[in-house]
Amino acid sequence: MTLQISIDELLRYSSEERDKWRQWLVTHPAAMESPVQPAGGFPTIGKLIDHIFIVERRHLQRLQGQPLSSATGLTGNNVPPLFDYGASVRRELEQYLRELGDEEADEVRQFNVRDRMWPMTPRKLLFHILLHELRHWAQVALAVRLAGFDPPGDHDLFYSHALQ
């Protein structure tokens, strides 16, 4: 038996999570400063969300053969502009997906990441973008709980309307 999830289903699930977190963080803006990795690259929830969105931008730029952005240009502590940036990148990703043909999606290409060439298909990189984001939303949920907040519920795919 073959069970599968489509990129469209995973994209819808990811978008549901973004919307849920955006709505919650607008009403709990102090949570943006909650610690994630105090001595690491993502010291706060806001900085981790900024990372989610810039990584999506950079991987999309890789797929399109464009120069890579170095940063979002945002502080990572103001919910509306940060999520607006993420929504803008997501619209571009959705447009890329609409234009991507099946053959092109499965053609192995070389992607330069961290000064190393990685052979992979655009299909793999697209799934990675979404799985990368979903893993980080789980980290956000844990950080929110550890900071004493009650996060928005029903994050599991089980509760999602993205697929039946």
Protein language model regions, located:
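Short, contiguous alpha-helical
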Residues: 8-25, 30-72, 114-164
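A mid-sequence interfacial segment
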Residues: 91-127
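Short, contiguous pre-domain boundary segments
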Residues: 1-3
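Helix-adjacent hinge/juxtasegments
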Residues: 65-105
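Solvent-exposed, well-ordered amphipathic alpha-helical segments
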Residues: 5, 15-18, 56, 84-93
